[in-house]
Amino acid sequence: MKIQVENVSPVERKVSIEVDPDRVAQELERAYAGLGRRVKLRGFRPGKAPRKVLERQFRAEVESEVLEKIVQQTFAEAVKVESLPLVAPPHVSVSEGVADGKPIRYTARVEVKPAIAPKDYRGLEVTRKAPEVTDQMVSDELSRLQDSLAQLVPVEGRFEAQEDDWAVIDHEGTIDGKPFEGGKAEGVTVKVAPGAISDGNLEALKGKKLGETVELDEPFPEDHRVEQLRGKTAHMKVTLKALKTRQLPALDDALAKEAGVEGIETLDALRARIRADLEKREKRRAESEVKDALVKAALAKNEFEVPPALVERAIDSMLEGAAERFARSGIDIRRLELDFAKMRADMREQALLQVRGALLLEAIADAEKIEVTDEDLQAEAARIAEELGAPLAKVQQQMRGKDAREALKNKVREDKALALLSSAANIQPA
């Protein structure tokens, strides 16, 4: 096999590969032998059909499979021989395919990690903001807790729905005059607010009195979870049965107990726990801001190109994170009218910074010969378990897989590189 590597750019290589005719012939022979054992042809016992007969019927299929197999195998071999630090799958172009007595020739364009010789990363000058927790921050957290423990109670002395009420309804729907599954229900609670009834909102009830019925058309989106309803419009009859409102619990010891925080029985104890948690959070935030500042300062002294594939992957990860946050709030991001192209464009700068920072920290770790020990991994697992409030054994179990362990190892190595930058930096109070 002949391999030629051309540097297209600091982050791209063009790999030209020529595969010997003998290897091609051997793979063809193996492919036809395997095919002969599998297929049944009239007039031949299993495994006895001559290759020429097989070629007449299956040549294109066999040659396609052999070409794919040889390209996969030889490209992997070339990557190993040339020590190419790939960051994405190759773009392959075959110039000469499978032919009797001839070599296979193809090229693969690949993105690779840039070669970085880090410099001037010691003595960086950054500022550190002192973490601060105010009484207002504690009160805000208590208010959020209070809101999360609110309950729906009947509205007293009023019989007309207002915005932000919670309405108990019976509804009956039809599509093209026919009932549909899920169209009829009783005792359903919806919010009197803008939005779709399928999302738990019904603004049309505003101003309606108990016992009144409203009629409306409800369009279902093209990506509705029920396939039969996608793109259809339902005619709904909705009857208002009861009105409820959210009632906040009092800020007292009973709320502190209801919060379910271990060891907390009084409001004063809850305030103290919230303050302690906020102090930890603000300390972590201050440390994170210093780390971000150190990375930005180091990047300012080290210019290098970044593989586009890594940036796109970082954007994908950011979008997945956004989708997960929406999902935790009960919102399907696919049903929102979002401009994903604009979102990707808006995320690009942050994604580029993330990728550049990770590549530089990896290069610094290489330059400083930073190693990660089993003790380091155990300590990180213990830290994660404490932060999540999860059993250490459970965290360790999740990290036993090869990919999870490698990801953890990379994070610990990156953290060690950051610690080195911090210890060698000139950090002044903000």
UniProtKB/Swiss-Prot annotation:
InterPro entries: PPIase_dom_sf, PPIase_FKBP_dom, Trig_fac, Trigger_fac_C, Trigger_fac_C_sf, Trigger_fac_ribosome-bd_bac, Trigger_fac_ribosome-bd_sf, Trigger_fact/SurA_dom_sf. Keywords: Cell cycle, Cell division, Chaperone, Cytoplasm, Isomerase, Rotamase. One of its GO terms (molecular function) is protein folding chaperone. Residues 164-249 form the PPIase FKBP-type domain. Coiled coil: none annotated. One of its GO terms (cellular component) is cytoplasm. Its main location: cytoplasm. GO terms for biological process: 'de novo' cotranslational protein folding; cell division; chaperone-mediated protein folding; protein transport; protein unfolding. It is found in: Cytoplasm. It comes from the Bacteria. It catalyses: [protein]-peptidylproline (omega=180) = [protein]-peptidylproline (omega=0). The keyword Chaperone applies. Its EC number is 5.2.1.8. Consists of 3 domains; the N-terminus binds the ribosome, the middle domain has PPIase activity, while the C-terminus has intrinsic chaperone activity on its own. Belongs to the FKBP-type PPIase family. Tig subfamily. PANTHER family: TRIGGER FACTOR CHAPERONE AND PEPTIDYL-PROLYL CIS/TRANS ISOMERASE (PTHR30560), TRIGGER FACTOR-LIKE PROTEIN TIG, CHLOROPLASTIC (PTHR30560:SF3). Involved in protein export. Acts as a chaperone by maintaining the newly synthesized protein in an open conformation. Functions as a peptidyl-prolyl cis-trans isomerase. This is Trigger factor. It comes from Anaeromyxobacter sp. (strain Fw109-5). The lineage of its organism: Bacteria, Pseudomonadati, Myxococcota, Myxococcia, Myxococcales. The gene is tig.
